[in-house]
Amino acid sequence: MYLYFETQDRDYKVIIDSGKLQSRIMYALSDSHMHKILQSTSLYDKPAIDIIHEQELPYSTAYKKIAELVKWGLLVTYKSEIIDGKRVAYYKSTFRSIKVNFEGALDTKVEAEPNLDALERLTLRFYDL
């Protein structure tokens, strides 16, 4: 993964050159349920139940897709709290925006604007282990 910065208006962009991550991003964007989940969590952290109601997703499908997006690193558990004795996880997309540039079979470029607060949470959680 290659990272470059444009510091004028703090517009950070990441060029993703890992074939595996590119494939996962393109798959997630082409899957309608994953796409809706990423859209819903690109700006604000939300619990799964809010994502399900807001995007009108089937419960079991939504939970499976959320777990897969977390495993791929495209979604992070932003925070969790206990409500009525149950742990509720809030999710946030790792990226604020994603741009895919497809120029034939040999050149596919994926550029993304990271959600810096989501990545910061992920980093803090990693160092807490």
Give, region by region, the residue ranges found by the protein language model.
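N-terminal leader segment of winged-helix/HTH proteins
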Residues: 1-25, 72, 81-82
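Short, cationic-aromatic polyanion-contact patches
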Residues: 22-31, 47, 80-102
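Short helix-to-turn junction characteristic of helix-turn-helix DNA-binding domains
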Residues: 29, 38-44
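Short acidic, hydrophobic short linear motifs in intrinsically disordered regions
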Residues: 44-54
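Alpha-helical residues within the helix-turn-helix
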Residues: 53, 70-71
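Amphipathic alpha-helical dimerization/coiled-coil segments
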Residues: 96-129
